[in-house]
């Protein structure tokens, strides 16, 4: 028997798993959230209805990340979002960089590859939070800069 509390698991070919990850409606399964998790989420929503501090801090961190990426010549898509897509433009290198960031630098980021994005637009999608420190962001950007050179990726010329 399998005992589960929350989450799910899929098996299949790489193509099938990639399709499900890319096009399923958010990995929604029938498992309900535990009451403590639901209560915590409700408390967070109530707090954020009255507080602008977290949003302002996140905007500051996003601006800082973009500035540091620019200073290192690491290409990223400009958008009004809190999501900072760092452009790799190569599916194999995108996965390799994601793996190296996790294994060697303890930084988790999901590679975004085809079919989620068109071929040739592969990217790493970063979302700085209000709780990330400037040191965290510096560590990320310095790690990326090292890998950028190691993987022979092109830089943006200022």
What are these regions (language model features)?
Residues 20, 24, 28, 45-52, ...:
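Structural signal for hydrophobic packing residues in well-ordered secondary-structure cores
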Residues 103, 116-158:
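PLP-dependent enzyme catalytic core of the Aspartate aminotransferase-like
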Residues 7-55:
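Conserved core segment of the aminotransferase class I/II
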Residues 19-20, 97, 136, 140:
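Hydrophobic side chains in well-ordered alpha-helices
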Residues 13-17, 91, 131-133:
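Short, glycine-/Ser/Thr-/acidic-enriched flexible segments
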Residues 55-66, 70-106, 114-116, 121, ...:
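Conserved PLP-binding catalytic core of the aspartate aminotransferase-like
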Residues 1-3:
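Short, small-residue-biased leader/transition segments that mark boundaries at the very start
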Residues 5-7, 31, 86, 111-113, ...:
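Thr-Gly-centered strand-to-loop micro-motif
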């Amino acid at each position: 028997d399998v005992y589960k509390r929350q989450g799910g698991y899929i098996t299949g070919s790489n193509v099938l798993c990639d399709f499900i990850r890319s096009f399923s409606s958010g990995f929604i399964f029938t498992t309900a959230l535990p009451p403590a998790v639901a209560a915590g989420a409700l408390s967070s929503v109530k707090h954020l209805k009255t507080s602008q501090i977290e949003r302002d801090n996140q905007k500051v961190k996003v601006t800082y990340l973009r500035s540091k990426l620019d200073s290192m010549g690491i290409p990223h898509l400009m958008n009004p979002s809190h999501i900072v897509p760092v452009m790799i433009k190569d599916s194999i290198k995108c996965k390799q960089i994601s793996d190296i960031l996790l294994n060697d630098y303890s930084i988790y980021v999901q590679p975004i590859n085809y079919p989620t994005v068109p071929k040739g637009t592969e990217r790493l999608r970063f979302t700085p939070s209000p709780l990330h420190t400037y040191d965290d962001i510096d560590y990320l950007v310095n790690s990326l800069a090292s890998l950028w050179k190691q993987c022979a990726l092109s830089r943006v010329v200022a």
